[in-house]
Structure formats: C-alpha cells, structure tokens
Regions:
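Short coil/turn segments that connect the beta-strands within blades of beta-propeller domains
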Residues: 54-56, 105-107, 149-151, 197-199, ...
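Beta-strand-rich domains and repeat architectures in extracellular enzymes and scaffolds
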Residues: 37-68, 96-98
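Beta-propeller domains
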Residues: 8-30, 57-89
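Repeated scaffold domains used in trafficking and secretory/extracellular systems
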Residues: 42-50, 92-101, 136-149, 184-195, ...
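Blade-loop segments of beta-propeller domains
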Residues: 80-108, 113
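A short beta-strand motif characteristic of beta-propeller blades
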Residues: 30-41, 81-91, 129-136, 174-185, ...
Length: 263
C-alpha cells in the first residue's frame, strides 16, 4: 500500500473500546532473502503475491506509479525464475492490485483495486488469466485473503493509524462477522493478507500482526527496517513474502513463525 491508496481511505470511524485484551508479543521476525525479481520497465513495484497450488507457482502482481500498467509474473518456487508474465492496462478493474490471493476451489485470483473504486474485488481466472467482472462489496476493501480451510474471505481495513477492522465474508461475499483490533502501529499504511483456519496475518510498515479466529491479536512481531513487506503466502509449510526494498522487488522466506498457523 502506498501514499495514493492511503489518501483514498477517507471514511471516518468512531472507534469503540476493544472488547478483548490484546495479547501481543514483541519479538524480531527473521526474514531470509531468496531472490530479486527482475521487472519489466513498464512497472516499478510489487503489491500482491500468492501461491497457486494447481500450477505450483508463486504469483507476483506488479504495477507502475500511476496504476495504469499491471504485470502478473508467475515464478518457479524452486528456482525463483520468472516462467510466465501477463500484461494489463486496467486501471479501472485492477488499479493498484493491493494484495493477491488464490482460491483453488474455483481457480481464481482475487485482487483489490484500491484507487479507482475502494469497494471492489476483481477476479482473474488463473488459467486463461482473463480479468472478470469485479465484485462490489458494501464495505471498503484493501487487503484481501482467501481462507481455504473455512471457504471464507478476510478483509483488513485501516481505520486509524493503529486500529484495523477485520471483515469476514462467506464464499458468496456476504459479510458474516467483523472484529476491530489494535495493531499497535503509528501509521495508516497496511499491507498483505493471509488467512488459514480462521487465523489472519497482515503487515504494517514495521511489523507482522497475527489475529486468531476470535479477533484477538495474539502476536505482533517486528521485521527489518528499510523494507516493505507487501504480501505473503504459504507453500509446503513455509511462509514466503514479496518485498519492496530500495527500488527492488525481492522474495523472502520466513523459516519460523512465533505462532501456530494451520497452512
């Protein structure tokens, strides 16, 4: 999420007192750099990342500065070499491509526009890579993930510099519950989304935040400064993350997590 998306978040919320205490643990989280991904000259940053279990590829969504060009790269998860790419000029449908998630049940990626229309989630058929008709939600959506264990979707929406709303949707995109949590952060910037068995992970500019299925913040772990973790996903029991750092796009692994995630 960059400044253009932050500027687009215009809703003002009354923040209630949290019903449950935050149970966070501050500890550094090690990230191991695996590779730099070379980008085409028409794009300059990544915003979405996920794992396609059908193709066995990482999928990286990259954009240009004004959200008019998008490239989706497929990456071999072993060699970390680009094996395919798909180019778009779809500001109205794809826009910022803020987060990317894969639903293996219907073989579709989902991304959020976040700049032209902050209420839409756009599907992309994962074999043809055709962009489909957007899904309009009643709530704003910026960080979006599919929970395959529960066949649900999770959306993390910034409220203030510290507070976030976590919205949960069924497989037909009907909202089923909402939690408001304190990410203990001092910036509205919010990145990434991962969901598994009711648990949710997202990042701020400096931390990973883990929330359980009852809306309790179980862990907040810092990561190395000077990088921006944009999105993350699991493959074979290990988490991987796409990072913007010093004008480069890099893939990192997280060999251990300080909390249990069913992935």
């Amino acid at each position: 999420m960059d400044q253009g998306v932050i500027d687009y978040i215009t809703n003002v919320f009354d923040i209630p007192k949290l019903a449950q205490p935050v149970s966070s643990v501050q500890m550094p989280l090690p990230l191991t750099r695996l590779a730099e991904i070379p980008l085409d000259s028409s794009v300059n940053q990544c915003q979405g990342f996920c794992y396609n279990s059908k193709k066995d590829v990482f999928v990286l969504a990259c954009i240009n500065a004004d959200n008019t060009k998008q490239i989706i790269y497929e990456i071999n998860p072993t060699t970390l070499q680009v094996v395919a790419k798909y180019e778009y000029s779809q500001k109205r449908l794809l826009g910022h491509m803020n987060t990317l998630t894969y639903n293996p049940n219907n073989n579709r990626y989902y991304t959020t526009n976040a700049v032209v229309d902050g209420y839409i989630v756009t599907p992309i058929e994962a074999d043809s890579m055709i962009v489909e008709v957007p899904i309009k939600l009643k709530e704003k959506v910026f960080n979006f993930a599919y929970d395959k264990e529960r066949n649900e979707y999770v959306s993390i929406v910034p409220l203030t510099n510290s507070h976030r709303t976590i919205n949960y949707y069924d497989s037909n995109f009907n909202k089923i519950k909402t939690y408001k949590i304190d990410a203990e952060h001092t910036d509205l910037n919010n990145n990434g989304a991962y969901a598994a068995n009711g648990n949710t992970i997202f990042t701020t500019l400096t931390t990973f935040v883990f929330i359980d299925d009852e809306g309790v913040v179980k862990n907040i772990s810092s990561y190395t400064s000077g990088m921006e973790v944009e999105d993350m996903d699991y493959r074979n029991g290990q988490m991987y993350a796409a990072v913007n750092r010093n004008g480069k796009v890099e893939i990192y692994s997280l060999p251990t997590l300080p909390f249990s995630v069913n992935a």
